[in-house]
């Protein structure tokens, strides 16, 4: 049985003080959230420690926004799996379209990050998705399949999450039709050959479309950006209803 993962990616938002204030508002809103789903937030690295103090014993789980493949070393601006594990972090986002774009992260590097996360007991959330130009040229499926095959090489699909995030829908207000997102997620499941693989959709997810997205047969959660910055908005997403 695939247990959905509802994850909020705060990106470069929230100071430690703001994160504590958010958590105090958010936790009561998910006290009655059904146990058939995971609720996760990926704060900036600076806020992970303070949030870990607040979320222990609650429904809320923590993710990092990236993770390196080494335990330590001369890797300025990176964070290691062992550092994250000290702060109750359970998930690690890898391969998000922004590091791919701004820091030229390759599929090989993303795979190394994912394998390292798994080796340390973290659950990688491996992001894949096509740009608007690739979609217009009819290359979307080829691009996504390459990212999936190279990014997941030598990993255990039962201990990771794949997030399909069409780049053209991230932060643009454009949303991939639920049926099309479901079709792509189904393709990813078949390419990986793992019926229990958890596959999220990410791209302008908001309270107004969460119920439709989560009603799809191959969508097992969402990776939320802007809408996760408001506790009431993200709580509505976490408390989605499909019937």
From Swiss-Prot:
Listed under catalytic activity are: D-glyceraldehyde 3-phosphate = dihydroxyacetone phosphate
The subcellular location is: Cytoplasm
Q: Binding residues for substrate, per the UniProt record? A: 9-11, 171, 204, 225-226
Record's keyword annotation contains Ribonucleoprotein: no
A GO term from the CC aspect: cytosol
The record's section on InterPro entries has: Aldolase_TIM, TIM_sf, TrioseP_Isoase_bac/euk, Triosephosphate_isomerase, Triosephosphate_isomerase_AS
Chief location bin: cytoplasm
Q: Which PROSITE patterns match?
A: TIM_1, TIM_2
One annotated GO molecular function is: triose-phosphate isomerase activity
Identify the metabolic or biological route this protein is part of.
Carbohydrate biosynthesis; gluconeogenesis; Carbohydrate degradation; glycolysis; D-glyceraldehyde 3-phosphate from glycerone phosphate: step 1/1
Please give the CDD domains that the UniProt record associates with this protein.
Answer: TIM
Q: What is its EC number?
A: 5.3.1.1
Q: Does the keyword field hold Cytoplasm?
A: yes
Keywords from UniProt, A to Z, are:
Cytoplasm, Gluconeogenesis, Glycolysis, Isomerase
Residues of the active site: 96, 165
* GO process annotations (BP): gluconeogenesis; glyceraldehyde-3-phosphate biosynthetic process; glycerol catabolic process; glycolytic process
Which family does this protein fall into? Belongs to the triosephosphate isomerase family.
Q: Sum up the protein's function in the record's words.
A: Involved in the gluconeogenesis. Catalyzes stereospecifically the conversion of dihydroxyacetone phosphate (DHAP) to D-glyceraldehyde-3-phosphate (G3P).
What is the protein's quaternary organization? Homodimer.
Q: What is the designated name of this protein?
A: Triosephosphate isomerase
- Give the organism, scientific name: Prochlorococcus marinus (strain MIT 9313)
